[in-house]
């Protein structure tokens, strides 16, 4: 993005990042905030639900079982702010608001859908691995291991 095309509301620090690839490993990189929004429990589910079709708020709330109104509103706001979700308000009574994905949102949701599909398909193997892990004798923590070594060496 060239300086002339940058939105005027960007700070100088953000403008710097608007012109280069993000670096998730850099503490100050705004990509970390985007990562938080996209990979949060509710962010993942909202993005994949909106990949299916446009939803109203109440439809999304039913589709994403377990999300509170407050968390859904915060999640939608963050995803809208990041440019992934489009919020369309219709001037009717009662008010109607539709949520859909932007082209950028469809792109990220497509990647996330691959992960969510893999999780659903792999769930039996994951549950089996958890059961196997739980059945093993726990390994001692750092301090416990040191005490165990001292006892053995005496």
Protein language model regions, located:
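Beta-hairpin "wing" of winged helix-turn-helix
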Residues: 80-100
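C-terminal regulatory/oligomerization modules of transcriptional regulators
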Residues: 1-27, 81, 86, 103-154
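N-terminal helix-turn-helix DNA-binding core of bacterial DNA-binding proteins
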Residues: 21-71, 98
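Ser/Thr-centric signal marking residues that sit
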Residues: 68, 75, 102
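Glycine-/small-residue-rich active-site loops that bind phosphorylated ligands and cofactors
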Residues: 52, 93, 107
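Short, flexible helix/strand-to-coil boundary loops that buttress conserved ligand/catalytic motifs
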Residues: 61, 89, 112
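Basic amphipathic alpha-helical segments that dock to polyanions
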Residues: 72, 76-82
């Amino acid at each position: 993005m060239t300086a002339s095309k940058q939105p005027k509301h960007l700070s100088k620090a953000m403008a710097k990042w608007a012109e280069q690839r993000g670096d998730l490993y850099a503490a100050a990189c705004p990509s970390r905030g985007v990562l938080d929004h996209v990979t949060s429990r509710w962010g993942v589910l909202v993005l994949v639900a909106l990949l299916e079709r446009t939803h109203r708020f109440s439809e999304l709330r039913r589709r994403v079982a377990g999300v509170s109104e407050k968390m859904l509103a915060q999640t939608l706001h963050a995803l809208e702010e990041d440019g992934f979700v489009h919020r369309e308000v219709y001037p009717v009574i009662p008010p109607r608001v539709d949520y859909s994905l932007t082209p950028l949102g469809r792109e990220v949701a497509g990647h996330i859908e691959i992960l969510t599909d893999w999780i659903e398909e792999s769930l039996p193997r994951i549950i089996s691995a958890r059961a196997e892990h739980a059945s093993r004798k726990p390994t001692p923590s750092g301090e416990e291991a040191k005490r165990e070594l001292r006892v053995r060496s005496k």
